[in-house]
Amino acid sequence: LKDLGTEALCEELMLRDVAAAADLLRPMYDLTGAGDGYASIEVSPYLAADEKGTVEAAVRLWNKLNRPNIMIKIPATPECIPAIQAVLEKGINVNVTLIFSKEVYDKVANAYISALQARAARGESVRNISSVASFFVSRVDAIVEKNFDDLVKAGKAKAEDKENFFGKVGVANSKVAYASFEKLFSSDSFKALKEQGARVQRPLWASTGTKNPVFKAVMYVEELAGRDTVNTMPPATVKALIAGATIEPRLHNGAAEAVALISKVNTLGVPTEQLLKELQVAGV
């Protein structure tokens, strides 16, 4: 290791850690028939605007780890959407990260479906290819509320209007994306793939620890519970979940109300679409 450069050394250490994690999770992978038990490794963020470089890095990491329960984490930047499709077409599992809007989510989901269609057209298997679409939650509330507070300070908004959306935009934004997930993966085009053994690309709720102490620790976990989803929680949220939470399928209801809430926030002067784009740029 001492002869490696900084970036190569970092990658080697990550490979060792992720390989160990994947081996630890392998029994779950086998038990669930490749449904769960995955470990993710991220391509370099310096490649976030490099389609060709991202594909090459994903293939290299996949081959080095040589385990079926690995996901290669790739950001959903405009340049990487084609890379995501190309990597999936090669039969490599992908964790698509840094999704903040329905617009970007739709591109990610369609890239997944297109990749499987391309494999099927070539007579290649679509079984056991797994992917998640990591959709971020709490960061949305944080940036929307900060933007609104700035508007209030500038005299461009009324402080009392905040109660209309306080702690609700992240969940609403996620529900809008989930409604799109249900529509896309119940379509005739995906049904044909499902008959060949294809799995849905599950939405993964990321950043689900509450950043504001006034919120219930498991707020996002409770509100986003639903079928075919994954939730990555920080340790404190896991402890709060174990201590007591009400888990019921709330995610499947309220899509229309979610759209109305986001529209209301926009009318108050908060540029939600622009803020969601800024979150992705900052995340990279």
Predicted ranges, named:
Residues G197-V284:
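Flexible, acidic glycine-rich loops studded with aromatic residues
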Residues D23-D30, N63-N66, N110-A121, D149, ...:
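Generic secondary-structure signature for well-ordered alpha-helical cores
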Residues I70-I74, V94-L98, L275:
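Short catalytic-loop micro-motif centered on adjacent basic/acidic residues
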Residues E11-L15, L47, L98, G167-V171, ...:
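Hydrophobic alpha-helical scaffolding
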Residues N66, A86-V94:
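Glycine-enriched alpha-helix->loop->beta-strand junction motifs that scaffold or abut catalytic
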Residues L1-A83:
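Active-site beta->alpha loop and helix N-cap motifs at the rims of alpha/beta catalytic domains
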